Amino acid sequence: MDTIYALASARGKAGVAVLRLSGPQAYEAVAAFGVSLPEVRRAALRRLTWNGEVLDEALILLFAEGASFTGERSAEIHLHGSAAAVSSVLQALSELPGLRLADAGEFTRRALDNGRLDLAQVEGLADLLDSETEAQRRQAMRVFSGAIGKRTERWRSDLIRAAALLEATIDFADEDVPVDVTPEVRGLLERLISDLKREVDGSRVAERIRDGFEVAIIGAPNAGKSTLLNALAQREAAITSEVAGTTRDVIEVRMNLGGLAVTLLDTAGLRETHDPVEALGIDRALTRARAADLRIFLLDQSGEVVGLEPEADDLIVQGKADTRLTRGLSVSGLTGDGIQELVEALQDRLLARTAGAGSFTRERHRLAMERAIRAMESAHVQLMQGVPHPELAAEDLRLALRALDSLVGRVDVEALLGEIFSSFCIGK
């Protein structure tokens, strides 16, 4: 197997830059810089030389096979974070036989291949690297720490027990089986189905935390939607004008709201129009507003809600509070009056939705659990009917087991890896 190397830290000027090596020649590659090797897991300062020239002073760390991130013999070189120092060491490594620059995500791929991580942990690491908010970080850390693997292993153990009991009735069909195993199998399946359904519900919330919530600002033309968006975003994200119908397309602004990733949507004003371009913008506004997690209905002077019927958590807000007396929740994007109260109301509603978040954070997790549920429900129905053909119920349990195994990458893993590792840098 090749020994791979890459810059593991971000490019650019910094205090420290970290180079990572993994593979059978990792130690020899470090020694090629004319340094004595430190003990494993002991950092040591060494002067790196190449062709008689000092390249840099660096901290060297070695990791033994089976006790590193990748599971292979590995090394880290902590350099001064100058582009020139990093470039000189990378150039030297490229001249060594048996070494090559790592592909994107290849260190993590080797950790997966060597059993250091399961597929769900790899996804958790990808989410951790992409996390923007505290809620995303906490959720990604739960997945990266192995929460999905541990839970799946418990489910798998119970399912294997149920399958083994059912297989026994097939293997000894011509003999007297001393105990009727059907009640125990039914009980195991009922508990598993209940657990998985609860996790499916929680996964929908977890997906929203991972991807971010969408909040649409809707209302009549010139109600102040774009001004409100700018006030919430604390920057000029949308063009504002006294001319009604200025906003034609949906404007998106990503922000951190109370530790949650939120995308605010400024939409076209809702009204009857003969302008085909404006009509298209209104259609898009209604489509995005319906799909949003929450809507802010910004009222104009008429005080009428337009376009859609508000749902339970939606906020109805009186706009342009600086120009007239208002009741209830009201805001002024120009003066900032009421903005903090609106932000707090949004936070309360969105945080309440995260209370039921589970550990399963991706659509593929939810779909795999739903496949397992369907297969187990099919087996359970047959058991309730007396199992005239137990081999059919046993096949359902095998399908359920395969669905659970796909959660952690025991099966069907190759098709997913390209998509997952496409978001990794070469040093990860």
Swiss-Prot record:
InterPro entries: G_TrmE, GTP-bd, GTP-bd_TrmE_N, GTPase_MnmE, MnmE_dom2, MnmE_helical, P-loop_NTPase, Small_GTP-bd. Belongs to the TRAFAC class TrmE-Era-EngA-EngB-Septin-like GTPase superfamily. TrmE GTPase family. Residues 212-351 form the TrmE-type G domain. It is an enzyme of class 3 (hydrolase). Binds 1 potassium ion per subunit. Its EC number is 3.6.-.-. The lineage of its organism: Bacteria, Pseudomonadati, Pseudomonadota, Alphaproteobacteria, Rhodobacterales. It comes from Cereibacter sphaeroides (strain ATCC 17025 / ATH 2.4.3). One of its GO terms (biological process) is tRNA wobble uridine modification. GO terms for cellular component: cytoplasm. This is tRNA modification GTPase MnmE. The keyword Lyase does not apply.
